[in-house]
């Protein structure tokens, strides 16, 4: 079982900046980050999210998002891919960074999930 990280943001700059930050502590994990629409504007796109999921080399993906439609697109993609997605409702930067660092260090999925549960955003 291989695990990877997927980041979905409405902003191309947030997605690329967070990916760059994560690469400082997690150089070897499978990481994809998508932000914005096809034309570079703010928003999310089902097709771009699906591509980010499919481009990730891992079979089991820990996914992180910034706002509502990013979550909605992850939910839709999770129904249409063979990959196993776990969608975390945690702060995007802190959650993705923590999960990536732990994954790089060889932590189990359960250990990562336990750490992220402390960050859960209540509805």
Swiss-Prot record:
<keyword id="KW-0598">Phosphotransferase system</keyword>
<feature type="domain" description="PTS EIIA type-4">
    <location>
        <begin position="2"/>
        <end position="123"/>
    </location>
</feature>
<dbReference type="InterPro" id="IPR012844">
    <property type="entry name" value="DhaM_N"/>
</dbReference>
<keyword id="KW-0319">Glycerol metabolism</keyword>
<feature type="active site" description="Tele-phosphohistidine intermediate; for EIIA activity">
    <location>
        <position position="10"/>
    </location>
</feature>
<keyword id="KW-0418">Kinase</keyword>
<comment type="pathway">
    <text>Polyol metabolism; glycerol degradation.</text>
</comment>
<protein>
    <recommendedName>
        <fullName>PTS-dependent dihydroxyacetone kinase, phosphotransferase subunit DhaM</fullName>
        <ecNumber>2.7.1.121</ecNumber>
    </recommendedName>
</protein>
<dbReference type="GO" id="GO:0047324">
    <property type="term" value="F:phosphoenolpyruvate-glycerone phosphotransferase activity"/>
</dbReference>
<keyword id="KW-0547">Nucleotide-binding</keyword>
<dbReference type="GO" id="GO:0019563">
    <property type="term" value="P:glycerol catabolic process"/>
</dbReference>
<dbReference type="Pfam" id="PF03610">
    <property type="entry name" value="EIIA-man"/>
</dbReference>
<dbReference type="InterPro" id="IPR039643">
    <property type="entry name" value="DhaM"/>
</dbReference>
<dbReference type="GO" id="GO:0005524">
    <property type="term" value="F:ATP binding"/>
</dbReference>
<comment type="subunit">
    <text>Homodimer. The dihydroxyacetone kinase complex is composed of a homodimer of DhaM, a homodimer of DhaK and the subunit DhaL.</text>
</comment>
<dbReference type="GO" id="GO:0016020">
    <property type="term" value="C:membrane"/>
</dbReference>
<dbReference type="InterPro" id="IPR036662">
    <property type="entry name" value="PTS_EIIA_man-typ_sf"/>
</dbReference>
<keyword id="KW-0067">ATP-binding</keyword>
<keyword id="KW-0808">Transferase</keyword>
<dbReference type="GO" id="GO:0009401">
    <property type="term" value="P:phosphoenolpyruvate-dependent sugar phosphotransferase system"/>
</dbReference>
<comment type="function">
    <text>Component of the dihydroxyacetone kinase complex, which is responsible for the phosphoenolpyruvate (PEP)-dependent phosphorylation of dihydroxyacetone. DhaM serves as the phosphoryl donor. Is phosphorylated by phosphoenolpyruvate in an EI- and HPr-dependent reaction, and a phosphorelay system on histidine residues finally leads to phosphoryl transfer to DhaL and dihydroxyacetone.</text>
</comment>
<dbReference type="InterPro" id="IPR004701">
    <property type="entry name" value="PTS_EIIA_man-typ"/>
</dbReference>
């Amino acid at each position: 079982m291989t695990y990877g990280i997927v980041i979905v943001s409405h902003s191309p700059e947030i997605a690329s900046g967070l990916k760059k930050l994560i690469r400082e502590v997690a150089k070897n994990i499978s990481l994809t980050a998508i932000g914005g629409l096809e034309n570079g504007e703010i928003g999310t796109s089902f097709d771009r999210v699906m591509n980010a999921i499919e481009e990730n080399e891992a079979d089991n993906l820990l996914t992180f998002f910034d706002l509502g439609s990013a979550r909605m697109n992850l939910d839709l993609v999770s129904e249409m891919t063979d990959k196993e997605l776990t969608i975390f409702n945690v702060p995007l930067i802190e959650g993705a960074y923590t999960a990536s660092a732990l994954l790089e260090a060889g932590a189990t999925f359960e250990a990562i999930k336990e750490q992220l549960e402390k960050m859960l955003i209540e509805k």
